[in-house]
């Protein structure tokens, strides 16, 4: 280590952060949103770099979607202090504005490495990371080159028939979002024993769109550490990012460790995060074939997860299914009616689900109230009867993620009814539910127990049918007993929770 290195007056991360802030101010907001590009602050970058477990020796580090290079700089700062002999950096970035600043940051990294007598090499690749990676992976006898990867990938959906989807399929990757595609490609380019740290939306932890991604991640890597923020806006406060983000650390080719370390903090600058160790089989339940990743941050959350996750039944055990409504309004516009008229049936939209009950019809509403009955719509309807409904997207004013309502058949004198595809409906093999079972489900789904449990499972406001299938439920007898205790007309949270706690002996 040179004498200058021992007297560095300012951290590399602080220098880089000033470059990041200057670059951020020059970015066009519309373009940034289009690219799904949100840069890591020095606090987030340090947090991520601190999760790596090995800095000694030689490092080949990949930073895909590098921005100004904040993540690489944070790694360099740690590695030079902790025994690194050489660092070879590969940064992918396609924005000219970012590349201009990235060059400056890598020059600072080079100076830092030289001062600590660490051999330094760098490469900036101004190409699309997905295309370049696929081309690499398809080379005969390809051998992974990186032993470190640090990522803050773009957050954008991938079109079902888009160019990216076709490229990814060539190397066996199914991805619905750029962020999962970037992480999946980085994993494939890591050597066995290589470490990956990424910050992404939490949405990959559950839901059908990320099944393939979770399977690849957990098949090929050990999930070792997770860092969660207690506020949606904590990680990217300056960028108005409302997604709930998490940071995670993986080791490729390592047998899954028995314990996952979960860190939680109020924000990236929090110097005293809560640290909680959780058995892996409580993070990823063995009885969940979709490999949902269930994050608990303290003993209270763990107890709640064990209570809710330890309930005896699946939906199939109860003879119940949950499906998404069949009516996609824009595909059958000609068969929609604002008013309930002759030869039509009720069409239930999220607007009709209010305070855990159904309000129908709604005059002067934005959405229709009825569906015309004809050959084109016959397969979009279900038999009129009792169903439990939930919104797929939670309204901003709702305090709970799952808001359940009971649909009763006496709403109209009809044989069938239509449910919009932004609604989930519980049914018995396509037919209505028994009243006692429906009431029991209604109480259970609207309980604080399930709301808290669902928030642990789910990092966004969507409530998909797959998520509802993944829940555990009381027995049929317990649900019927719960229904018998409902002696109130309008929704009352306190009474709902009292019934659930007493009936399921959760106190």
UniProtKB/Swiss-Prot annotation:
It catalyses: a 2'-deoxyadenosine in DNA + S-adenosyl-L-methionine = an N(6)-methyl-2'-deoxyadenosine in DNA + S-adenosyl-L-homocysteine + H(+). GO terms for biological process: DNA restriction-modification system; methylation. InterPro entries: MethylTrfase_TaqI-like_dom (IPR011639), N4_N6_ade-DNA_methylase (IPR050953), SAM-dependent_MTases_sf (IPR029063). It is an enzyme of class 2 (transferase). The keyword DNA-binding applies. Keywords: DNA-binding, Methyltransferase, Restriction system, S-adenosyl-L-methionine, Transferase. Its EC number is 2.1.1.72. The keyword Cytoplasm does not apply. PROSITE patterns: N6_MTASE (PS00092). GO terms for molecular function: DNA binding; site-specific DNA-methyltransferase (adenine-specific) activity. A gamma subtype methylase that recognizes the double-stranded sequence 5'-CTGCAG-3', methylates A-5 on both strands, and protects the DNA from cleavage by the PstI endonuclease. Monomer. Belongs to the N(4)/N(6)-methyltransferase family. This is Type II methyltransferase M.PstI. It comes from Providencia stuartii. The gene is pstIM.
């Amino acid at each position: 280590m040179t004498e200058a290195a021992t007297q560095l007056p300012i951290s590399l991360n602080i220098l880089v952060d000033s470059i990041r802030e200057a670059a951020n101010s020059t970015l066009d907001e519309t373009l940034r949103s289009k690219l799904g590009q949100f840069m890591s602050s020095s606090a987030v970058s340090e947090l991520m770099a601190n999760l790596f477990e090995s800095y000694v020796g030689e490092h080949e580090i990949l930073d895909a979607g590098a921005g100004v290079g904040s993540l690489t700089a944070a790694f360099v700062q740690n590695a030079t202090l902790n025994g690194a002999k050489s660092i070879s950096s590969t940064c992918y970035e396609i924005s000219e504005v970012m590349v201009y600043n990235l060059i400056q940051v890598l020059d600072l990294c080079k100076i830092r490495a030289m001062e600590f007598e660490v051999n330094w090499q760098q490469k900036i690749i101004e190409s699309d990371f997905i295309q370049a990676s696929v081309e690499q992976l398809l080379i005969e006898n390809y051998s992974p080159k990186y032993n470190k990867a640090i990522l803050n990938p773009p957050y954008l959906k991938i079109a079902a028939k888009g160019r990216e989807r076709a490229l990814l399929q060539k190397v066996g990757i199914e991805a619905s979002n750029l962020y999962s595609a970037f992480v999946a490609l980085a994993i494939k380019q890591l050597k066995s024993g290589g470490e990956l740290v990424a910050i992404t939306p939490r949405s990959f932890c559950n839901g059908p769109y990320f099944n393939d991604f979770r399977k690849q991640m957990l098949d090929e890597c050990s999930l070792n550490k997770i860092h969660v923020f207690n506020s949606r806006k904590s990680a990217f406060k300056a960028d108005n990012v409302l997604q709930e983000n998490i940071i995670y650390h993986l080791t490729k080719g390592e047998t899954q460790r028995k314990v996952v370390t979960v860190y939680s903090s109020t924000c990236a600058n929090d110097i005293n995060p809560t640290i909680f160790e959780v058995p892996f089989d409580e993070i990823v339940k063995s009885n969940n074939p979709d490999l949902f990743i269930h994050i608990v941050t303290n003993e209270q959350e763990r107890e709640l997860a064990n209570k809710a996750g330890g309930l005896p039944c699946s939906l199939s055990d109860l003879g119940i299914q949950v499906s998404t409504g069949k009516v996609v309004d824009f595909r059958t516009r000609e068969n929609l009616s604002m008013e309930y008229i002759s030869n039509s049936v009720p069409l239930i939209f999220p607007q009709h689900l209010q305070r855990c009950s159904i309000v129908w019809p709604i005059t002067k509403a934005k959405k229709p109230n009825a569906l015309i009955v004809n050959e084109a719509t016959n397969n979009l309807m279900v038999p009129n009867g009792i169903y439990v409904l939930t919104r797929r997207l939670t309204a901003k004013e709702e305090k709970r993620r799952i808001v359940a309502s009971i649909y009763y058949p006496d709403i109209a004198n009809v044989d069938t009814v239509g449910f919009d595809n932004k609604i989930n409906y519980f049914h018995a093999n396509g037919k209505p539910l028994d009243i006692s079972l429906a009431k029991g489900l209604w109480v259970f789904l609207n309980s604080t127990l399930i709301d808290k449990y669902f928030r642990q499972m789910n990092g966004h406001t969507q409530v998909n049918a797959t998520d509802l299938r993944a829940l555990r439920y009381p027995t049929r007898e317990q649900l019927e007993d719960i229904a018998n205790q409902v002696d109130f007309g309008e929704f009352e949270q306190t009474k709902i929770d009292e019934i659930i706690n007493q009936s399921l002996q959760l106190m």
